[in-house]
């Protein structure tokens, strides 16, 4: 397929979506009502297969859908793991009954998922997890601890990895479950970060229960299922392109999915600032720079004419474009390691964008808003909301090279699985889990 063919197909997709938005977007709908329209039409999770509540689109086209919805002035799909991680994992490894039962509430925002993978003793070495699942008839009983659980305090279900056979090698005795987070045996404790937010949580599981009907994939084959989840996580990170402009340009604040956050019954139009107009529709078709957020911020701060700032903005545009093109390249045929390379690149991009944002803000960058009241006050200062976002990005930039698999893990995967380099010495992958050496 040529670049011209891709562009034509992209324009056709945008035209179809804009026509649908003109007919169906209504800011007076509740968030839940709007997301149900969006999800059941396949626009909320367009990468899912057409028979699984999606449209079978590539990641590049899915990003185009997201940007078009935002620039049109409508509320986008539910953010988070329900659409990006849980749904594609379930559609890949689940039964037809599980797909029809679990995917619709996820893509329509009725329930929110979190990821119960990492543990205090199993982060980079995820297969070393110790959380146990013991079968009791049609129920599995879960005991263990998880940590760095993003959005756990808002989750209805968790993507749980638990050890179901400690006598097997560590990669072979793991099973993937969709666990109900609303039960007495699940204790969620938020972890406040230096940004002022509590994105992460630690989760204690004490005789918690999960039905065997909510087991995704075969017993003890959870590592293969988890690799699907991780592939989508890393691919999603690598496809962002570093942009901070058009995808969030019309959001006043983010709407959260699920029953806990309380956004489903709120008015959808209260989460966006733009209404559909002819000008907005035409703007939806125009390509935008991955560095658009920094361009707008530099203009607001009066430094757009400074040569060094302009040079680094161009660098941000180039890096973001390369990330997008890597995603486009992977559409033609599977590229080994492309998700890992993409995540490595995104780690570099967020750190570059952190430094660029601080260079644009100058002394203004020393001020950060730690709560909603402070954010409202600081949005009135030079730089506005863009400055508030830039300081938050600066404090959070180092997280991406760590979560979802550290940069070092990505390089190991590329070296061993793509380049065929020897594995690290001391490989213990064939030993049964209960014979592995452990800290006292």
Segments predicted by a language model, with ranges:
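Glycine-rich beta->alpha junctions and the first turn(s) of the following alpha-helix
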Residues: 189-323, 400, 439-440
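Internal helix-loop-helix
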Residues: 40-110, 150-157, 320, 324-342, ...
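Short glycine/proline-enriched turns and hinge-like loops at secondary-structure junctions
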Residues: 57, 125-127, 151-155, 170-173, ...
């Amino acid at each position: 397929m040529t670049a011209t063919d891709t562009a034509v197909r992209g324009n056709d997709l945008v035209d179809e979506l804009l026509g649908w938005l003109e007919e169906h977007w209504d800011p007076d709908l509740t968030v839940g009502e709007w997301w149900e329209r969006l999800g059941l039409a396949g626009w909320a999770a367009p990468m899912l297969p057409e028979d699984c509540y999606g449209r079978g689109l590539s990641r590049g086209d899915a990003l185009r859908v997201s940007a078009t919805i935002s620039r049109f002035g409508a509320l986008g799909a539910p953010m988070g793991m329900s659409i990006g991680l849980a749904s594609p994992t379930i559609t890949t490894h689940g039964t037809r009954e599980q797909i029809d039962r679990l995917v619709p509430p996820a893509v329509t925002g009725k329930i929110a998922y979190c990821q119960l993978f990492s543990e205090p003793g199993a982060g980079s070495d995820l297969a070393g997890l110790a959380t146990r699942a013991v079968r009791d008839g049609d129920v599995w009983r879960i005991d263990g601890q998880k940590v760095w659980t993003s959005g756990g305090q808002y989750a209805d279900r968790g993507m749980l990895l638990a050890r179901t056979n400690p006598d097997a090698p560590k990669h072979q005795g793991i099973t993937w479950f969709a666990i109900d987070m609303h039960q007495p045996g699940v204790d969620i404790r938020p972890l406040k970060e230096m940004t002022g937010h509590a994105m992460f949580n630690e989760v204690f599981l004490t005789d918690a229960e999960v039905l065997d009907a909510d087991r995704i994939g075969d017993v003890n084959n959870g590592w293969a299922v988890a690799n699907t989840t991780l592939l989508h996580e890393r691919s999603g990170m690598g496809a962002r392109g570093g942009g901070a402009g058009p995808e969030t340009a019309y959001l006043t604040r983010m709407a959260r999915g699920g029953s806990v956050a309380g956004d489903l019954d709120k008015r959808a139009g209260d989460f966006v600032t733009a209404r559909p107009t002819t000008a907005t529709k035409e703007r939806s078709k125009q390509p935008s720079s991955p560095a658009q957020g920094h361009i707008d911020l530099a203009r607001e701060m009066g430094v757009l004419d400074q040569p060094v700032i302009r040079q680094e903005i161009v660098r941000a545009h180039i890096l973001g474009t390369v990330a997008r093109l890597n995603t486009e390249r992977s559409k033609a045929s599977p590229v080994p390691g492309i998700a890992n390379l993409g995540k490595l690149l995104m780690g570099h991009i967020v750190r570059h964008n952190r430094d660029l944002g601080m260079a644009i803000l100058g002394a203004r960058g020393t001020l950060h808003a730690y709560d909603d009241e402070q954010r409202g006050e600081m949005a009135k200062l030079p730089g506005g909301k863009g400055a508030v976002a830039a300081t938050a990005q600066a404090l959070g930039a180092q997280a991406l090279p760590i979560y979802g698999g550290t940069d070092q893990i990505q390089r190991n995967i590329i070296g061993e699985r793509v380049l065929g380099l020897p594995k690290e010495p001391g490989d213990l992958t064939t030993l049964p889990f209960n014979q592995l050496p452990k800290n006292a």
